């Protein structure tokens, strides 16, 4: 069975000072369906946003972000498991940092746990350990983490569900004639200098971090699919019907 990593960004599952329970509900229903066809690993963001629903402190302060992540991570996992239970599924939490992937021993231990979870029908739910991962908390929104997870945990494909519904030849928020690129086989260096960002305070990623993730995966003969996390129809059609009706495939 093909193994995939699904990464969902903070922008998709949080809004204002709360989690978007409707989008989380739709996401989990989608994941449950995917688990019938694939070995699925979820990489989730939004621990800080989840913490902010419980404690209203300034989230721009780095130490406050650490505190919010520490509060929010167990709450976020509990929400996932409450929703997964409706499909007779269980999620297991794995907290990692970029440094864990620098150690082959740590990577192997994590992979062993993930392999066993999948064998037992459990959904591995990975998040960055934002309470300690200072570098990652500042910029990235788990895009790099999800790329590393795809490579080191032997997945074939990374699916990023984002508020960015694909890669465009120019910034679609500034140019009405911007065209979405359906397939990309090579990441141009000038693209990595782009300044197209997401429009929410709830995450730290943008198109550049996603392109860097795609570049890493292409260099390791893996694929990445970027699609909207707000409207899951594109991702559903791609993964469940093997048709591309939107998004951008990096292969």
Curated annotation (Swiss-Prot):
Reactions this protein catalyses: L-glutamate + ATP = L-glutamyl 5-phosphate + ADP
Record keywords, A-Z: Amino-acid biosynthesis, ATP-binding, Cytoplasm, Kinase, Nucleotide-binding, Proline biosynthesis, Transferase
GO cellular component terms attached to this protein's record: cytosol
Binding, ATP: 7, 162-163, 168-173, 204-210
Transmembrane intervals: none
Annotated metabolic or biological route of this protein: Amino-acid biosynthesis; L-proline biosynthesis; L-glutamate 5-semialdehyde from L-glutamate: step 1/2
GO process annotations (BP): L-proline biosynthetic process
Class of the enzyme per the UniProt entry, highest EC level: transferase
EC number(s) reported in the record: 2.7.2.11
Cellular location(s): Cytoplasm
Principal location class: cytoplasm
GO function terms (MF aspect): ATP binding; glutamate 5-kinase activity
UniProt binding sites for substrate: 45, 130, 142
Disulfide cysteine pairs (residue numbers): none
PROSITE patterns linked: GLUTAMATE_5_KINASE
Sequence similarity: Belongs to the glutamate 5-kinase family.
Function statement: Catalyzes the transfer of a phosphate group to glutamate to form L-glutamate 5-phosphate.
Protein name: Glutamate 5-kinase
Annotated gene: proB
């Amino acid at each position: 069975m093909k193994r995939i990593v699904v990464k969902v960004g903070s922008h998709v599952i949080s809004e204002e000072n709360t989690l978007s329970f409707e989008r989380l509900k739709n996401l989990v229903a989608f994941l449950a369906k995917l688990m019938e066809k694939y070995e699925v690993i979820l990489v989730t963001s939004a621990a800080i946003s989840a913490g902010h629903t419980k404690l209203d402190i300034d989230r721009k302060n780095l130490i406050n972000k650490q505190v919010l992540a520490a509060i929010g991570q167990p709450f976020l996992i509990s929400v996932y498991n409450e929703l997964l239970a409706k499909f007779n599924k269980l999620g297991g939490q794995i907290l990692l940092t970029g440094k864990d992937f620098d150690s082959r021993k740590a990577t192997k231990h994590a992979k062993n746990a993930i392999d066993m979870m999948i064998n037992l029908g459990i959904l591995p739910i990975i998040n960055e350990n934002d309470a300690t991962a200072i570098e990652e908390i500042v910029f990235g929104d788990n895009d790099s983490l999800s790329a590393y997870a795809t490579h080191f945990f032997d997945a074939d494909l990374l699916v990023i569900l984002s508020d960015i519904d694909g890669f465009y030849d120019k910034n679609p928020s500034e140019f009405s004639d911007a065209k979405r690129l359906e397939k990309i086989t090579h990441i141009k260096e000038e693209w990595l200098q782009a300044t197209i960002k997401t429009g929410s305070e709830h995450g730290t990623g943008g198109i550049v971090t996603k392109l860097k993730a795609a570049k890493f995966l292409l260099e390791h003969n893996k694929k990445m699919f970027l699609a909207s996390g707000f409207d899951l129809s594109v991702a559903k059609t791609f993964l469940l019907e093997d048709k591309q009706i939107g998004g951008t495939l990096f292969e």
